[in-house]
Amino acid sequence: KPPYGLLNIEAYGGLIRHAWLDRPLSVAGKVITKGPSAFAPQSHLINFEKPVAVIPEPAIHMNRTVNESASFNIQTNMLPLLTLLDKDTTDDFFLSALGNICHIEKDEILAYDLNLYPLIQPTYIGLNNEFIGSSRLDNLTSVDACMKALETSHPQGLSLICLFDNEEVGSRTKQGAASFIIP
């Protein structure tokens, strides 16, 4: 058994895998816990808001061909490192952490849907701050451009923008553009 606690993950969409290596990562999402009855569970939106994980990249002497082809298996090469394990750490260390952030006992957790995210703040880059460095620029810049266009236009009728999730996987989810939200 390895002496560290790892988190099993599932990749979503068109992931640029090497971009997630050696970055401080945090965890946010929804935790479902026991409620007043079996038919009324509680929902908690959580965000650790601090670096709690990293996906370490092996040193060059451990992978001599890394510069020739950056091929990473998500289930074996990209498991986020969360903690060092000692004799007192149990296998459910992550459930304990979720229980702590929700202020409940770990046994009350029924389910969770969580996401890792890079904890690096966006910044201006360049001699004249003419560039923006940030994660998810493809989505954020599109939303920003749409919002600015909507704010500065002077339409005679109704103007709106539609922003959907899941375009990376074909928009065919319940909240995607190909869903039944808009006929």
Language model: regions and residue ranges:
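N-terminal hydrophobic/helix-forming segments and targeting peptides
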Residues: 1-183
